[in-house]
Structure formats: C-alpha cells, structure tokens
Regions:
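Thiamine diphosphate
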Residues: 1-8, 66, 76-176
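Terminal amphipathic helices with adjacent charged low-complexity linkers/tails
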Residues: 1-25
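Charged, low-complexity, helix-prone segments enriched in Lys/Glu/Asp/Gln
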Residues: 17, 21-40, 109, 151-163
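Active-site diphosphate/adenylate-binding microenvironment
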Residues: 27-109
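Poly-acidic low-complexity segments
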Residues: 1-3, 20, 48, 61, ...
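Serine/threonine-rich low-complexity intrinsically disordered regions
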Residues: 3, 15-17, 35, 41, ...
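Alpha-helix C-cap/termination motif
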Residues: 14, 59-62, 112, 140
Length: 176
C-alpha cells in the first residue's frame, strides 16, 4: 500500500522527472514513427497491413470505439500504432492466445458497451476458425466489425516447427 501511495503522489505532483521522461519518450516515438510512416501511408497493391492500420487510426472515432486484435501477426502489427486515447478504448493483451480470440472479445465489449463501435483485427488464418463466433454475434445482436488482414500466412513466430516450415511450408496459406 505504501508503494502505491508514493506512486500516486508522484504522479499527481507533476514531477519534473516525469515530464522529462515523457518528453524523452515523445522524441523517441516521433523518430520511430518517421521510419514507419511510409508503410502506414503506402500505396502499394495489395495494401499492406500497416496501411490498413494507418487508415483506421486516421478515420476511426477513437474516443467512441473499442479496438482489439487477434493473436500473432495482427497483434504485433497494430500494437505499436494504435493510440488508446481514452480508457477501455483498446483491449490489448499478452504475448499470444488462440486464433479467433478477438471476435468473442469484441462480442463481450459490445454487449457491455452497446453505444461503442467495436472493431477487431484478425488474420485470414484466424478468420477461418471463427464461423460460430460470427453466428454468436448475430444471434446476440452484438454488431461488431472485423477487419481480416488477408496476408496468406500463419504461424508467424520464427523458430517454431522448423521441419514443418522448411519441408511443408506450413506457414503459407495458399489453398494448395
């Protein structure tokens, strides 16, 4: 409890140390975003994942939306770029979970916040596992929006299942 009290007092004190840290983070983020801006604004065809995220961030009513992502690549792609501008507007979570987790998460968010626009990002691999969750959203009258990032790949984490990757191309979703 004492530690929490000290943290609260420090946060409320408008400490110059905290201001310096915030300024330093802002400078680093600005430089980092400069490197990524070409991807977020790219006109390449097909659209890259970062362009989709960049367009959503520019057009979405951030204060009246709740956004999440699915496991794997979509999480890694959106996490650095989505600005959570108000509490509970972005539901981010740990390293990974099962594919298809974003849709039920958004169903719950929509039922709890019916006036909010609820948006889920997921990959094409996860979308293929989510038919019953879409039916649940319809049945429960929980209108959500899902953006499917059609990148034709899954199992994006390097290092796992090397033989299956090399021999069978298990990360490629080609329909073959």
């Amino acid at each position: 409890l004492l530690t929490l009290q000290v943290m609260i007092e420090l946060a409320q004190s408008k400490s110059p140390v905290l201001s310096d840290i915030a300024r330093e983070i802002s400078v680093i983020k600005e430089a980092w975003m400069e490197d990524w801006t070409p991807f977020l604004n790219s006109d390449e065809i097909p659209l890259n994942t970062y362009r989709v995220i960049g367009d959503i961030v520019k057009t979405l009513d951030l204060e009246n939306s709740i956004v999440t992502h699915d496991a794997g690549g979509p999480r890694d792609s959106i996490l650095p770029f989505y600005p959570a501008t108000v509490p509970n507007s972005y539901i981010g979570w740990g390293k990974t979970t099962h594919l298809g987790f974003g849709i039920p998460l958004m169903i719950g968010a929509k039922l709890a916040n019916p006036d909010k626009f609820c948006l889920n990002f997921m990959g094409d691999g996860a979308f293929g596992m989510s038919g019953l969750d879409i039916e649940t959203a319809v049945r429960e009258k929980a209108p959500i929006t899902t953006i499917v990032l059609n990148n034709g790949g899954m199992a994006t984490y390097p290092g796992g299942m090397l033989t299956a990757r090399d021999r069978y191309g298990m990360t490629k979703m080609t329909g073959d």
